[in-house]
C-alpha cells in the first residue's frame, strides 16, 4: 500500500488530503478483506479477490450506513490501487475493475428559508453607503430568491427591460 501511495505522490496531481483519503479507504478495504478471508492479506490473497468478495465489501460498507456517493469514491480508490497492483504484479484484475459503482443522484439545492432571505436582503442594504448600489443589489437578490432567476439571467437584464411587468417570463438555459 505504501508503495502505491508513494507512486501516486510521485506522479503528482493529487493533494495531500486526497492521498490520506486513499490511504484510509484502502486500509479499511484491506481490513475487511482480512476478516472476510479470515487470514492476513498478502499479495496472493489480493490476486484472488473476486467479484463476490468485492460485492461483500460493498454490502458491508452500505450496511454500516455509508452513502452510495461515498462508496463510489471508496470503490474508485480501491480500483486505482488494483490497477497499479495488477500492473506491478503482472496479473489480470479485470473482474475487480469491472465492478460498477453504485448509482447516486445529485441532491437538489435546498431553498433559502424566507426569514434568511429577508435577513440577507436587509444586510445587503446596510453594506453600501450609495443608495443606488444598495437598491441594485437588493433588486438582484430579490430576483434571485423570489423569481428563481440564475445569477447570469439576472445580470443579463438590460435597462430596456425596465420597468419589469407584473408577470415575469424567464427564459433560462436553452430558452426553457
Residue ranges and their predicted role:
Residues 1-176:
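Conserved catalytic core of the tyrosine transesterase superfamily
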Amino acid at each position: 500500500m505504501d508503495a502505491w501511495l508513494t507512486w501516486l505522490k510521485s506522479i503528482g496531481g493529487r493533494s495531500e488530503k486526497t492521498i490520506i483519503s486513499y490511504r484510509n479507504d484502502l486500509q479499511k478495504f484491506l481490513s475487511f478483506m482480512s476478516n472476510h478471508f479470515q487470514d492476513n492479506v498478502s499479495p496472493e490473497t489480493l490476486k484472488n479477490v473476486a467479484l463476490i468478495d468485492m460485492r461483500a465489501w460493498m454490502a458491508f460498507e452500505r450496511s454500516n450506513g455509508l452513502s452510495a456517493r461515498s462508496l463510489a469514491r471508496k470503490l474508485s480508490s480501491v480500483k486505482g490501487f488494483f490497477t497499479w497492483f495488477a500492473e506491478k504484479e503482472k496479473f489480470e484484475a479485470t473482474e475487480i475493475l469491472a465492478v460498477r459503482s453504485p448509482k447516486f443522484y445529485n441532491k437538489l439545492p435546498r431553498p433559502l428559508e424566507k426569514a434568511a432571505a429577508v435577513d440577507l436582503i436587509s444586510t445587503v442594504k446596510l453594506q453600501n453607503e450609495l443608495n443606488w448600489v444598495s437598491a441594485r443589489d437588493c433588486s438582484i437578490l430579490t430576483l434571485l430568491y423570489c423569481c428563481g432567476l440564475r445569477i447570469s439571467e439576472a445580470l443579463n437584464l438590460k435597462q430596456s427591460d425596465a420597468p419589469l411587468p407584473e408577470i415575469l417570463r424567464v427564459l433560462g438555459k436553452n430558452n426553457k
